[in-house]
């Protein structure tokens, strides 16, 4: 049975690679890469190449409205472009997609054991004879099939295939998110928080994951004393802040002391300066309102993005894994420049919570 499951995984990986290759080397490649559903000013590969080109000829990529990712990622793209041919670069994106699917699958296998323990503790507080409770619990025999389903969804869903074909840099973002979850689930505190600070450096909206990651780490340590729990969370916050400050310092060194990237990467995104149409609502709203009200509504919309994490954390603190899932849903809905690559992050994790599909209003 195990060998059959592995054979299916190999088959879906092969099929996913073939789908991506058939589209990448077809006449539809350029059309897909230009679609606003797939590429945004913050993840389009054409902008990454332009940024690297400007850097190589001695022009600051952050002077104009060209490149809007952090200097660390800019130099990573430069490294890839310099050592690989164009067709070889594409297979780096394909490999990143495969790794993301496998890592998310591993995360679900590991987390399911903890979720079973959480459910068992919660059952002690309720009537264990209630037959409705058993219907909403994870069945241990379903964890392997759920993990396999995640691989199928991620590798075969158009929301993952199209960004890979377009070589959207969000492919690397999704891989980092998966690695953060894996490191936190395996209780690698320093690694998970460093990776979170790295991804926050590039897209600060993913700082929303900080509460759930801290709670996952605290949950894994199983501190029963409230004082030790508090100190564990504070220590995690300290590691994250120090890592983020260090990465910002390294970025400044890469830019030879210039702070122009702060305006291009963070202020540009916060003020929603590019009103290119996308699948979000920010661009439409801010293209219609009077400039007199623009600053007010920018703050309202941005606060609206972050405010939900407070009640969600308070309500779901006992189940940080579900909190992380809901956080990804919130992130994909309310961020200013969403693409389909944001949607696949939580869609591929739906099988993990398939035991809740029976819930009815």
What residue spans do the PLM features occupy?
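Hydrophobic alpha-helical membrane segments of integral membrane proteins
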Residues: 172-176, 192-195, 208, 345
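Alpha-helical transmembrane segments of secretory-pathway, organelle, and plasma-membrane proteins
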Residues: 347-349, 361
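Primarily membrane-embedded glycan-assembly and transfer machineries that use lipid-linked glycans
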Residues: 2-179, 190, 214-330, 339
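Aromatic-enriched
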Residues: 354-361
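Transmembrane-embedded, aromatic-rich helix segments that form part
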Residues: 192-196, 205-219
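Extended, structured, electrostatic nucleic-acid-contact surfaces
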Residues: 182-197
């Amino acid at each position: 049975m195990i060998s059959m499951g592995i054979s299916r995984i190999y088959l879906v990986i092969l099929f996913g690679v073939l789908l991506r290759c058939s589209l990448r080397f077809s006449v539809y490649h350029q059309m897909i890469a230009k679609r606003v559903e797939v590429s945004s000013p913050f993840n389009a590969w054409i902008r990454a190449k332009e940024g690297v080109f400007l850097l190589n000829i001695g022009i600051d990529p952050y002077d104009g409205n060209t490149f809007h990712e952090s200097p660390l990622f800019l130099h990573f793209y430069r490294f890839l472009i310099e050592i690989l041919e164009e067709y070889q670069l594409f297979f780096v994106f394909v490999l990143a997609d495969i790794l993301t699917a496998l890592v998310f699958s591993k995360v679900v296998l590991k987390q399911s054991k903890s979720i079973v323990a959480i459910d068992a503790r919660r059952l002690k507080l309720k009537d264990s004879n209630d037959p409705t409770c058993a219907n909403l619990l994870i069945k241990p025999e379903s964890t392997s099939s759920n993990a396999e389903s995640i691989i199928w969804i991620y590798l075969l869903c158009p929301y993952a295939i199209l960004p890979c074909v377009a070589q959207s840099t969000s492919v690397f973002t999704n891989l980092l998110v998966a690695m953060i979850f894996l490191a936190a689930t395996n209780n690698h505190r320093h690694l998970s928080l460093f990776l979170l600070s790295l991804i926050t450096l590039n897209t600060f909206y993913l700082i929303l994951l900080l509460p759930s990651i801290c709670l996952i780490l605290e949950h894994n340590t199983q501190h029963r004393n409230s004082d030790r729990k508090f100190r564990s969370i504070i220590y995690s916050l300290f590691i994250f802040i120090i890592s983020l400050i260090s990465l910002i310092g390294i970025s400044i060194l890469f830019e030879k002391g210039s702070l122009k990237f702060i305006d291009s990467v963070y202020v540009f995104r916060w003020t929603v300066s590019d009103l290119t149409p996308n699948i979000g609502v920010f661009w439409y709203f801010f293209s219609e309102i009077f400039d007199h009200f623009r600053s007010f509504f920018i703050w309202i919309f941005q606060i609206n993005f972050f405010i939900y994490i407070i009640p969600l954390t308070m309500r779901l603190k006992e189940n940080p894994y579900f909190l992380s899932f809901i956080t990804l849903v919130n992130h994909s809905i309310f961020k200013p420049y969403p693409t389909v690559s944001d949607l696949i992050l939580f869609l591929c994790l739906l099988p993990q919570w398939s035991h809740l599909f029976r819930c009815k209003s």
